[in-house]
């Protein structure tokens, strides 16, 4: 089944069904808070956000009686019906900052083909560019300077079959972020900037504003577009041909290693999380999302902070110092989470510290140099003592236990 609901979610469904606002035999008016709750409570890995919202609303309205069994049944039925709906071809345009001369060719993630550094003299690009400019002019008589700068950037175009343009964008963004995650792990900044008038992302490759969905001919599908925060004074990184060659080689090696991982699906999620964490203009968010990344790769849901810190520190050259840094980062994270007053000027330092702290565990998780078969094997490895005397003692005890059991 694509979806699953725990007991506490089922209690919520039961309370919803017995609410006086719900008429007998049907669901009547459903408030957005109920749908929002169920949308975040249900695990549906194969559905986009748009599809999941449709599935929940349809299941709630069509299930004759709100029971756990009927709700799940109608969720799965609705999901299968979406698969059978008419799908159309779409192309999603993503202007990319920092990818000049670096990312080219075609890649496929999931069921999405991505073409990088699209030829803007092609018939599709000419029509798409004209429609993008027209779209913006209908909102303003003059194009913002930022948008003018964006249109000069290289494009990545995602080709996808989908039920509508919103679903097409969500799936395309999900796919291309994996590719940008690969490049970001290799190219993101490792040290703080000496001079910076404002907070800028750590990633050196970014989605630029004004992302649009088009028909295969290039005509824009609707007046909707996606926009993210941007700084008009950002200068794209410059790279020599030798640097570009080295980056591409490292990306290809990392790509091959991820494809062979026993936990490949989760590793691809890590690529998305890494890109998103360090693409923020608000570096406090980068710091917090960096900690979430540590939680994602450092253990299961029940893993405590002390254990996460110990595991991340174990893989560093100086575990004792790294553990102290990890405890400091956790303290700052707790202060921010609870709304305590901190020095905002240290956001950049914290973000880079977090990135550096999680890096060894991240690289080990994505490359699996010790050929572990399960994530838990990696975590157990990181739980071993750092001190050689303690390791020797533990090894002797294990050898003694093995000898005893073999008798």
Mark where each language-model region is.
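Charged/polar positions within long, soluble alpha-helices
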Residues: 302, 334-341, 363-371
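Histidine-centered, metal-coordinating catalytic motifs and their short helical/loop contexts
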Residues: 319-351, 359
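Charged, non-catalytic interaction/linker regions at domain boundaries
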Residues: 23, 32, 36-285, 361-364, ...
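Charged, amphipathic alpha-helical stretches
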Residues: 1-29
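Short runs of predominantly hydrophobic/aromatic residues within well-ordered alpha helices
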Residues: 267-270, 283-290, 294, 322, ...
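Flexible secondary-structure boundary motifs
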Residues: 287-320
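Glycine- and acidic
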Residues: 272-278, 313-315, 339-343
């Amino acid at each position: 089944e694509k979806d699953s609901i725990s007991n506490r979610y089922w209690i919520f469904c039961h309370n919803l069904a017995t609410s006086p606002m719900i008429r007998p035999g049907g669901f009547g008016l459903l408030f957005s808070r109920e749908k929002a709750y169920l949308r975040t409570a249900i695990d549906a890995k194969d559905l986009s956000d748009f599809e999941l919202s449709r599935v929940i609303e349809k299941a709630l309205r069509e299930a004759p009686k709100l029971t756990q069994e009927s709700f799940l049944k109608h969720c799965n039925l609705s999901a299968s019906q979406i698969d059978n709906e008419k799908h159309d071809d779409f192309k999603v345009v993503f202007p990319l900052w920092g990818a000049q001369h670096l990312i080219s060719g075609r890649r496929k993630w999931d069921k999405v083909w991505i073409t990088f550094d699209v030829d803007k003299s092609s018939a599709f690009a000419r029509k798409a560019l004209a429609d993008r400019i027209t779209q913006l002019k209908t909102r303003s008589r003059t194009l913002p300077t930022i948008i003018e700068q964006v249109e000069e950037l290289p494009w990545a175009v995602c080709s996808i079959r989908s039920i509508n343009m919103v679903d097409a964008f969500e799936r395309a963004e999900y796919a291309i972020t994996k590719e940008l995650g690969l490049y970001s792990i290799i190219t993101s900044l490792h040290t703080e900037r000496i001079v910076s008038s404002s907070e800028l992302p750590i990633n050196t490759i970014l989605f630029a504003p004004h992302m649009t969905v088009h028909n295969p001919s290039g005509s824009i599908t609707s007046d909707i577009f996606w926009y993210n925060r941007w700084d008009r004074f950002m200068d794209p990184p410059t790279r020599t041909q030798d640097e570009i060659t080295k980056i591409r080689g490292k990306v290809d090696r990392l790509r091959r290693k991820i494809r062979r991982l026993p936990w490949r699906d989760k590793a691809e999620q890590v690529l998305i999380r890494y890109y998103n964490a360090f693409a923020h203009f608000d570096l406090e968010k980068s710091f917090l999302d960096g900690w979430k990344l540590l939680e994602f790769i450092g253990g299961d849901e029940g893993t405590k902070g002390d254990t996460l810190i110990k595991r991340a520190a174990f893989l560093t050259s100086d575990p004792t110092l790294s553990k102290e840094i990890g405890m400091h980062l956790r303290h700052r994270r707790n202060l921010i989470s609870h709304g305590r007053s901190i020095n905002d000027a240290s956001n950049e330092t914290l973000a880079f510290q977090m990135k550096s702290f999680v890096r060894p565990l991240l690289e080990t998780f994505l490359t699996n140099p010790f050929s572990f078969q399960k994530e838990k094997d990696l975590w157990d490895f990181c739980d071993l003592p750092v001190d050689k005397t303690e390791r020797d003692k533990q090894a002797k005890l294990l050898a003694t236990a093995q000898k005893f059991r073999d008798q």
